[in-house]
């Protein structure tokens, strides 16, 4: 079996920055305890488990403001997905120390929404309903931001303003965004289009679109809650034409998927730890469909190998 290691794949700079910020917080004895992360720092359970080992508590739920109400003291880290101004204000009111690990690309979208709304615009925002990134973006101007997810949602919009922009969640499929934006343009010909797919998402999707064409099957290593991981699987199937499966780690690979494959492509979401992906690649490279001894799937990566290294204070 040939393993096609799609490149680029895996960690993006926004994810690495967020994890380094959180690790530095864990190593800083001057910060009030406990230290909480408001939601999953990035959408990968291996990462949140590793932070739990470092004494950082992940509090997850569908609404950041509601989660915050459960915290009365200590330090709060805002995740890479961003939070609304209301969440930041409430944290200040509660006297909490806050650390912002928002991805710069997400901040850029928040700034765009803020600026346009101040100038009288209505904002159509293409994003995944229930995902924390749209939650934060909508929170910038709840009265003026309209969340849509599908072309069908465009038909339900009823915006009378002459000033409209359309923008999007940074981790969406660029092909989906382009298609939905065209639908918006048909309905509102005067709309301003601001595509905000982050570069890391874009190049990873394009790599899958091109490099997965040669494969019989694609394995995407990523958490089920990772939107960008799910979009990579979608791109493999819809753009490259190659059947794709998303797995959290090597233990989730089904032998039926790969036993007849001559070529298997592997990629990973932007929040997937590199050692977890390497374990998948190593398994596939030694796999022999005729030798059941090579079928054993066992995750051996320790949590201590999941997070990026940072220098301890004083080093």
Swiss-Prot record:
Q: Which cofactor does it need?
A: [4Fe-4S] cluster
What's its job? Catalyzes the conversion of 1-hydroxy-2-methyl-2-(E)-butenyl 4-diphosphate (HMBPP) into a mixture of isopentenyl diphosphate (IPP) and dimethylallyl diphosphate (DMAPP). Acts in the terminal step of the DOXP/MEP pathway for isoprenoid precursor biosynthesis.
Give the EC number(s) under which this enzyme is classified: 1.17.7.4
- Note the superkingdom of the native organism: Bacteria
Q: Residues in the active site? A: 133 (proton donor)
- Family to which the UniProt record says this protein belongs: Belongs to the IspH family.
- State how the cofactor is bound: Binds 1 [4Fe-4S] cluster per subunit.
Q: Know the name of this protein? A: 4-hydroxy-3-methylbut-2-enyl diphosphate reductase
- Biological process (GO), any one: dimethylallyl diphosphate biosynthetic process
Q: Which residues form a coiled coil?
A: none
Query: Which reaction(s) does its UniProt entry say it catalyses?
Result: isopentenyl diphosphate + 2 oxidized [2Fe-2S]-[ferredoxin] + H2O = (2E)-4-hydroxy-3-methylbut-2-enyl diphosphate + 2 reduced [2Fe-2S]-[ferredoxin] + 2 H(+); dimethylallyl diphosphate + 2 oxidized [2Fe-2S]-[ferredoxin] + H2O = (2E)-4-hydroxy-3-methylbut-2-enyl diphosphate + 2 reduced [2Fe-2S]-[ferredoxin] + 2 H(+)
Gene Ontology molecular function, alphabetical: 4 iron, 4 sulfur cluster binding; 4-hydroxy-3-methylbut-2-enyl diphosphate reductase activity; metal ion binding
The broad enzyme category this protein falls into is oxidoreductase
User: What InterPro entries would the database entry show?
Assistant: LytB/IspH
- Annotated isopentenyl diphosphate binding sites: 43, 81, 131, 226, 228, 271
Q: Which residues bind (2E)-4-hydroxy-3-methylbut-2-enyl diphosphate?
A: 43, 81, 131, 170, 226, 228, 271
Q: Which pathway does this chain act in?
A: Isoprenoid biosynthesis; dimethylallyl diphosphate biosynthesis; dimethylallyl diphosphate from (2E)-4-hydroxy-3-methylbutenyl diphosphate: step 1/1; Isoprenoid biosynthesis; isopentenyl diphosphate biosynthesis via DXP pathway; isopentenyl diphosphate from 1-deoxy-D-xylulose 5-phosphate: step 6/6
Q: Where does [4Fe-4S] cluster bind?
A: 12, 103, 198
The record lists dimethylallyl diphosphate as bound by 43, 81, 131, 226, 228, 271
Q: Which UniProt keywords apply?
A: 4Fe-4S, Iron, Iron-sulfur, Isoprene biosynthesis, Metal-binding, Oxidoreductase
